[in-house]
Amino acid sequence: MTHSPLAQFDIKKLIDIKMFGFDVSFTNSSIYMLLASILALTYFYLAFYNRKLVPSRLQVSAEIVYNLVADMLNQNIGVKGRKFIPLVFSLFIFILFCNLLGMTPYSFTTTSHIIVTFTLAILVFLMVTIVGFVKHGLRFLTLFLPHGTPLWLAPLMIVIELFTYLARPVSLSLRLAANMMAGHVLLKVIAGFTVSLMIYLKFLPIPIMVILIGFEIFVAILQAYIFTILSCMYLNDAINLH
């Protein structure tokens, strides 16, 4: 099973830790999440430590990422969304760096595990729910009854809307984990055949692998964007009660 495409997703204990009867061991998943956080902090520290009127390439790239998140919130929520920029920006950067770090050879893709993505999705779900109740009180419950719904159809619509609302963290987490896992499995399988194919096709498989890796990097960035834009849309529902 060493060469199984799924072996790359195995969680391995590095430091065995038990606390109050719970297993809180430091694993390869933990170290890559920590590494992603450190790399993200280092990147933005270097980008903004010595800001100049004529920005460096690093500063420009960091500002582009920041403006991307700010525009997402502005387009979905408006001015009211500005206060959520730090939280949503941190979420986007963490997922982005975890995804990209998983593209490096012999690394570990933390976002391919449903427990990681579900935890992030639950945080978004709780944030949206708390914001909704704090801002609107019990009127937030009107979210589950679309405006203009006939009275006789109200019970069914409430059940459907409630189910849809509760399913948000599930769909949000599954989408990210499934896409990251599928892409990495595909790369692993094709890479396994590359050496054999080179006997018959010479160097043709190499540019194909480069293209596939480039596409997977694009998917890694896209999935971080999708997770974040959906989080902004959910926040908009809670703030503006559409």
Curated annotation (Swiss-Prot):
It is a multi-pass membrane protein. InterPro entries: ATP_synth_F0_asu (IPR000568), ATP_synth_F0_asu_AS (IPR023011), ATP_synth_F0_asu_bact/mt (IPR045083), F0_ATP_A_sf (IPR035908). Keywords: ATP synthesis, Cell inner membrane, Cell membrane, CF(0), Hydrogen ion transport, Ion transport, Membrane, Transmembrane, Transmembrane helix, Transport. The keyword Ion transport applies. One of its GO terms (cellular component) is proton-transporting ATP synthase complex. Its main location: membrane. It is found in: Cell inner membrane. It holds the Pfam family ATP-synt_A. The chain crosses the membrane at residues 29-49, 84-104, 114-134, 140-160, 181-201, 203-223. GO terms for molecular function: proton-transporting ATP synthase activity, rotational mechanism. F-type ATPases have 2 components, CF(1) - the catalytic core - and CF(0) - the membrane proton channel. CF(1) has five subunits: alpha(3), beta(3), gamma(1), delta(1), epsilon(1). CF(0) has three main subunits: a(1), b(2) and c(9-12). The alpha and beta chains form an alternating ring which encloses part of the gamma chain. CF(1) is attached to CF(0) by a central stalk formed by the gamma and epsilon chains, while a peripheral stalk is formed by the delta and b chains. Belongs to the ATPase A chain family. Key component of the proton channel; it plays a direct role in the translocation of protons across the membrane. This is ATP synthase subunit a. It comes from Rickettsia conorii (strain ATCC VR-613 / Malish 7). The gene is atpB.
